[in-house]
Amino acid sequence: MLWEETGAAPAPARASDLPYRISSDHLKKEEKMTMMAHQYPSWIFINEKTFITREQLNSLLKTYNIFYENQKNLHILYGETEDGKLIVEGMLDIFWGVKRPIQLKIQDEKPFSSFTSMKSSDVFSSKGMTRWGEFDDLYRISELDRTQIPMSEKRNSQEDYLSYHSNTLKPHAKDEPDSPVLYRTMSEAALVRKRMKPLMMDRKERQKNRASINGHFYNHETSIFIPAFESETKVRVNSNMRTEEVIKQLLQKFKIENSPQDFALHIIFATGEQRRLKKTDIPLLQRLLQGPSEKNARIFLMDKDAEEISSDVAQYINFHFSLLESILQRLNEEEKREIQRIVTKFNKEKAIILKCLQNKLVIKTETTV
């Protein structure tokens, strides 16, 4: 009899049993999982199907922190709350895998006090760009060579902002300067609106509309873009935060306006398998379960409709195109044979039943005569 039915605490699992999985028939709802977590405080619940002991958690934490021995800021720590509940906290690596553009917020929640006193040269200096480097990594903006800026614009540098272009943008085309087209990057990893030259009267109005986002001035030209695929970011989370809360934390970090409902977290394994994290999953603990090495598994932020890839399908992903074609042809042939086998089987069974019915009809006719 299973331990949740008897009320007795489960026997400790061996390391080879990690993570220990139980039937979904016994833990169907998150409420029941929470109740059991209070009933068995020595157990750590990953989701409604997976749990580990504190000893196993300690082993995972030790392995993880040894891997990042020289990077103390990446260590995952744990402690206990006042009521004795264990909590784990640390930095979680998340990779960008979205295919739709994201929208930055036009206003920060907290005011930027030194906005008026800061000069343009200070804001966009190389030192400043290094300090805010992670924000720039989101869409890989590099400083425009000042020799490309017309002298008339240099004189107005205190009134206007300096334009920045993606380092993956195509060379300037001979389009009209006021054309509000979207440039397409060479890697097709980002969308950046082509800079328009506004009238002098519009510049002050535009400056009023800009806000400070993570230390950056809001820029209409680069406020909508697609982050480069596989670009990495970090977000501080804890074991109380489930999948949707982690997504919210990431969007909040970069002041992204899109709804958390538009995204999902996926674990992509080295084998090519891609598994979506459920709402009840705790991403930080899932990271621990997969080990510290990103070569084995990585967590991606993806669009909500991104498809999962099973382990069966993943084994074919890295094969050569010609080999995949031959495999597909073989599967089609096998499918046809299987269909024919089933059709033949049921035709035989139907023939036997029809023969029995005919025999009964003959006997019934003879009896009535």
Swiss-Prot record:
Pfam families hit by this protein: Nore1-SARAH, RA
Tissue specificity statement from the Swiss-Prot or TrEMBL entry: Highest expression in thymus, kidney and placenta. Also detected in colon, small intestine and lung. Tends to be down-regulated in 30-60% of tumors derived from breast, colon, kidney liver, rectum, pancreas, stomach and the thyroid gland compared to the normal counterpart.
Domain of life (superkingdom): Eukaryota
InterPro entries, A to Z: RA_dom, RASSF1-6, SARAH_dom, SARAH_RASSF6, Ubiquitin-like_domsf
Keyword Phosphoprotein among UniProt keywords: yes
SARAH domain: residues covered: 313-360
Modified residues (Phosphoserine): 187
Domain Ras-associating: 218-306
PANTHER family, sorted: RAS ASSOCIATION DOMAIN-CONTAINING PROTEIN 6, RASSF
Subunit structure comment from the entry: Interacts with MOAP1. Interaction with activated KRAS is still a matter of debate: interaction has been shown in the mouse, but not in human. Lack of interaction with MRAS, NRAS nor RRAS2 has also been reported.
Known role: Involved in the induction of apoptosis, through both caspase-dependent and caspase-independent pathways. May act as a Ras effector protein. May suppress the serum-induced basal levels of NF-kappa-B.
The protein, known as: Ras association domain-containing protein 6
